[in-house]
Amino acid sequence: MIQDIYPMKLDNAFQMKEPDADSRILAFRDRTVYLKNEGEITFLKYHVWVEYCKTHHKKVPGLVYLFSVDDISFYLTELYEDVEIPGFMYHKLFAVRSMKPKERVFAATTAWHLYVWYRDNQFCGRCAHPLVHSRTERMLQCPVCNNMVFPKIAPAVIIGLTNNDQIMMTKYAGREYKRYALIAGFTEIGETAEETVHREVMEEVGLKVKNIRYYKSQPWGFDSNLLMGFFCDLAEEGEIRLEEEELDRKSTRLNSSHMSESRMP
């Protein structure tokens, strides 16, 4: 799972701290992240960024502390439009998923989660005044009406629907991700995670389920989610009826679950 980076550990505690020379700098543009990928991810170091700015007679932009991975601190900033640092470029987040090492993939996706929150919450949704960063916790606050805005975390489920030795595999229709995937979806207002499992399976493939069992969860910063994994069994045989705006009819089916991981579609 994406958070499995042991023996390293992500420390997400809020801090007001200054960067050191080896702190890592993360910047995003659309759904891309600025890094070097030569066999493994290399993030921009703070001292390299400072030297670049000095050499090009530019002011070092402001930084926001994000988190640490072991003893390395990560910061968010905005790069200049014309920045050119040898080996570095903007990479699509979709491509980062398959890069190495795992702890840097996890760092990039978690940083993206926070970046989207900061980007989308510059003004108060109640009175429209600019929000300011709290100095005591990870929170944005309106100085006029005192509205407080915390990071967005959207609960969602991912479902292993089984029938004897088979498991339901789907393919999304018209999306960048082309590989097989389990049924998944967001939890709605007034709904438990277990009720989400029932609803999502019915909506996406038209089947009833039983014996819902919680498995594990994982943070999914790509879409600001907390993904909760469940297994469940097919309650009764029935025709698969696809939500065709979401799923590819030709590719969604029950597949053998006793296949080795390397043979799974």
Give the positions of each predicted feature.
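C-terminal hydrophobic structural anchor segments
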Residues: 223-251
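Cys/His-rich short segments
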Residues: 110-160
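Single conserved hydrophobic/aromatic residue that forms the stacking wall/gate
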Residues: 254-265
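Acidic pyrophosphate-coordinating catalytic loop
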Residues: 147, 218-227
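The catalytic Nudix box helix
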Residues: 181-216, 230, 234-236
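A gly/proline- and charged-residue-enriched helix-loop-helix capping module
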Residues: 84-126
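N-terminal alpha-helical interaction blocks
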Residues: 1-101
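N-terminal strand-loop-strand
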Residues: 34, 139-182, 186, 208-209, ...
